[in-house]
């Protein structure tokens, strides 16, 4: 039985990953953004929320379903907040290419073919829906959890 911290891919040596991650494992990828959230919250709010929820999911169901947490993707599509100092945003074409590259690298470097994306930023939703369909062609089974959709009434 592993704790949540030991199921964080970025904290393991390559030899540990090689011996632990299997074809049936589920890789959990938190995604956020670096953008304004008003004068009172940090720019990385979406990252913190997505990473914390992913950590809780892995802590709760990691052993039972062989879940592994990947490092957070901190930059997304945030052009609507470009006016605010500190906002980092990719273009649609760069974000799409970045997501495809992540998918290809996961397939190249790990045996797991199951990916859960935990998206903490509403601006990423459209591009994720489009590109994850393409990423299935890489042999990945992908589910995306959009936190904003969960909080809608």
Go through the PLM ranges and name each one.
Residues 75-153:
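Active-site histidine-anchored catalytic micro-motif
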Residues 1-38:
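Active-site and ligand/interface coordination hotspots across diverse enzymes
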Residues 21-31, 65-77:
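Short coil-to-beta-strand
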Residues 3, 20-21, 39, 62, ...:
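Soluble secreted/lumenal catalytic domains
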Residues 37-43, 84:
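A short glycine/serine-rich beta->alpha loop
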Residues 9, 49, 94-98:
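Soluble or luminal CAZymes and related metallo-dependent hydrolases
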Residues 46-59:
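Short catalytic helix/loop segments, enriched in acidic residues and glycine
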Residues 60-67, 106-111:
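A structural motif corresponding to the C-terminal end of an alpha-helix
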């Amino acid at each position: 039985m592993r704790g949540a911290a030991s199921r964080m891919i970025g904290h393991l040596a390559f030899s540990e990953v090689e011996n632990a991650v299997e074809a049936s494992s589920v890789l959990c990828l938190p995604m956020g953004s670096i953008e304004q959230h008003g004068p009172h919250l940090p720019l990385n709010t979406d990252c913190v929320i997505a990473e914390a929820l992913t950590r809780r999911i892995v802590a709760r169901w990691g052993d039972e379903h062989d879940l592994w947490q990947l490092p957070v993707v901190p930059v997304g599509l945030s052009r609507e907040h470009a006016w605010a100092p500190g906002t980092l945003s990719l273009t649609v074409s760069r974000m799409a290419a970045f997501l495809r590259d992540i998918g290809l690298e996961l397939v190249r470097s790990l045996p797991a073919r199951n990916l859960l994306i935990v998206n903490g930023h509403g601006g990423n939703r459209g591009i994720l829906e489009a590109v994850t369909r393409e990423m299935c062609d890489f042999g990945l089974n992908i589910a995306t959890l959009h936190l904003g959709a969960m909080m809608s009434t």
